């Protein structure tokens, strides 16, 4: 009874207390493959060449995919579609860890071996470390196709700041910095993708934005035959809003026609 004035229990409390609830990593399916991503070693570099031949030849590997294998749109993003799902040849990496290729294999150990066999040739470029550097007129462009590094600009004016400062008894001018903060949820990000009985790709995900996951997976695959079901979420704090493994697991399932589990390591 959800009427005002009635006491209600959390809808997920029973399955959590009894241990029957499932997080994505608790899902296992017959013939399930394990996915990993080869990630950029450089925060800003141009990818010149990707050689996946040796990885594809490794026993137990079912798929090695690059940007060329994406059937829909490579670029996704919640606010603006400017984030590469997989960095293509000729494209720029944007941070340490940008995905360049994904591998699906019979087990994670084999997938990790295959990852080490992929050869990538980079042109390492100067990277941008601060907002101030990025906003400078002569800053290297983060995105080739953009005029500059300013995503949006808005001017806000409230009151008379100069007058307020002039009439203040004390005025302190200083530069303050705070450290980076990791969301540090207990559960690493994980997704399991498979074809369901309707012939749709079903993604079991642990994220905070199931509708965005659905939209961006559909965009990547070039089809609306995608479903997203949120499993239990082991913490998020805003850190599980963007795509990390969901769309890549879906892509590997699309290519292999098999269930695929993909999970970030704690280091990732």
Give names to the regions the model predicted.
Residues 19, 63-68, 95, 172-176, ...:
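General beta-strand structural signal in soluble alpha/beta enzymes
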Residues 25-26, 82, 90-93, 161-162, ...:
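A generic local secondary-structure boundary/capping motif
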Residues 85, 181-185, 244:
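Short secondary-structure boundary/capping elements
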Residues 251-267:
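FAD-binding glycine-rich core of flavoenzymes that anchor FAD
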């Amino acid at each position: 009874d959800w009427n005002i004035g009635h006491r209600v229990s959390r809808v997920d409390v029973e399955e959590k207390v009894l241990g029957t609830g499932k997080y994505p990593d608790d899902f296992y399916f017959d013939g399930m493959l394990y996915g990993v991503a080869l990630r950029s070693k450089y925060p800003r570099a141009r990818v010149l060449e990707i050689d996946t031949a040796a990885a594809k030849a490794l026993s137990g590997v079912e798929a090695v995919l690059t940007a060329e294998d994406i059937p829909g749109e490579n670029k996704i993003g919640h606010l603006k579609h400017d984030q590469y799902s997989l960095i293509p040849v000729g494209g720029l990496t944007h941070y340490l860890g940008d995905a360049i290729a994904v591998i699906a294999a019979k087990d994670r150990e084999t997938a990790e071996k295959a990852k080490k066999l992929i050869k990538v040739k980079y042109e390492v470029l100067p990277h941008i470390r601060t907002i101030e550097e990025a906003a400078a007129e002569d800053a290297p462009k983060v995105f080739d196709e953009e005029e500059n590094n300013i995503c949006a600009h808005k001017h806000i004016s409230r009151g008379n700041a100069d007058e307020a400062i002039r009439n203040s008894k004390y005025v302190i001018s200083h530069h303050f910095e705070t450290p980076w903060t990791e969301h540090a949820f207990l559960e690493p990000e994980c997704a399991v993708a498979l074809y369901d009985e309707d012939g749709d790709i079903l993604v079991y995900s642990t994220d905070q934005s199931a509708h965005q996951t659905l939209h961006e997976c559909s965009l990547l695959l070039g089809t609306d035959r995608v479903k997203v079901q949120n499993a239990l979420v082991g913490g998020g704090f805003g850190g599980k809003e963007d795509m990390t493994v969901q769309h890549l697991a879906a892509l590997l399932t699309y290519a292999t026609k098999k269930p695929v589990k993909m999970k970030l390591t704690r280091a990732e």
